[in-house]
Amino acid sequence: MKERKKKKLNINSIIVKFLVAFFLFGGVLVMVTVSIQRDLAEAVANPGTQIVLDTRNSTRNSSLAIVVIIIYTFIALFLFVAKWTRSLKRMEDYLQDIGSGAFPEEPLKISGGDELSEMADVINEMKLSLEEKERMRNELEVARNIQAGMLPGDTAARKLPESCRVAAFMNPAKEVGGDLYDFFMIDPDHLGLVIADVSDKGVPAALFMATTKMCIRDNMALGTEPGKVLELVNNRLLENNKAGFFVTAWIGEIDLRNGHMAFAMAGHPFPFVRHGEGAKYEPLQSDRNLVLAGFPGFVYRQEEIDLLPGDRVFLYTDGLDEARDTDNGFFGKERVKEYLDAHSGAEPADVISGMKEAVDSFAAGREQFDDLTMLMVEYKGGSGNE
């Protein structure tokens, strides 16, 4: 972006001009007054007729000069004030247009080369800067919508087989974020689950996130086991990673016919699992492995468990447990578990929305600097292709 030269408006020069005009006008009046007094003194000292007549003429001429000076001064002052008033009104209208978001196409033009024209230049520079920020904001809003469109929503969740229920939520800390979640049917009997967190925020992280999501889904769609998927994705992300991003991730595959779940993780927080309706949640601990895009050729260990009907798995990114309040305290994994246990019987979507409300209440309005993503799946049992 081209750097613009900032202009400094010298308001003091306006005051100086007024003072100069005032002293010039005052000086002329003093000179004329002194001349009149001198003539009068001479007339008193020499009361001759011719001297008195000359004095009268001189006084009349001096008085006329004073009147002319005053008239011209007021005319000049009126024209000066009128020019400033018109220019200031134009500036006011121009700034009101900018303030309403309707940026004028043409720059503000005020001729004269004085402080008013300098002020107009400053306003034009401000308009260009605001236009650029507004353009960037609009582009980020479009990027946010595109990113949201890449993630499966309620419609995708309703299309899943009756043997499972899924709810998810993502709230980026900036306009676009580096978190991702995904759920999809690998085939009629197998459900794929993904949650991941890129090591940065904003547009670059969002682009890296999109690449990560595509690589994971493409490999899982081929029926590749989760551990091998992470290995392939890790090597792929390392091929062109000049920014030095890394990704924490958890991916799983559930056989909806029998509840068998294979999963692997890459440095991600442990999920919570609930075995049976009304049961307490416990961390689903496993080998955390290395983050993605961390080291080439790393082999990711895969874990397996069997889910029974009514079992749930709750996945999240560290934007949940590391959310902070006004005293700089963390929400923490303990509060996450407490909320899950207290709402063990609630619908997955209600658990997700309620957890978000609990975090917002805890933060008490403090701005959060990390993306927040959650995903919950409940295995209902039965055939995957019902």
Residue ranges and their predicted role:
Residues 1-89:
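Alpha-helical transmembrane segments and their helix-membrane boundary motifs
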Residues 102, 116, 125-140:
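HAMP exit helix and analogous amphipathic coiled-coil linker helices
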Residues 131-312, 366-386:
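… and, occasionally, acidic/histidine-rich disordered N-termini of signaling adaptors
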Residues 203-222, 307, 311-366, 383:
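Active-site-proximal, acidic helix/loop segment immediately C-terminal to a metal-coordinating Asp/Glu
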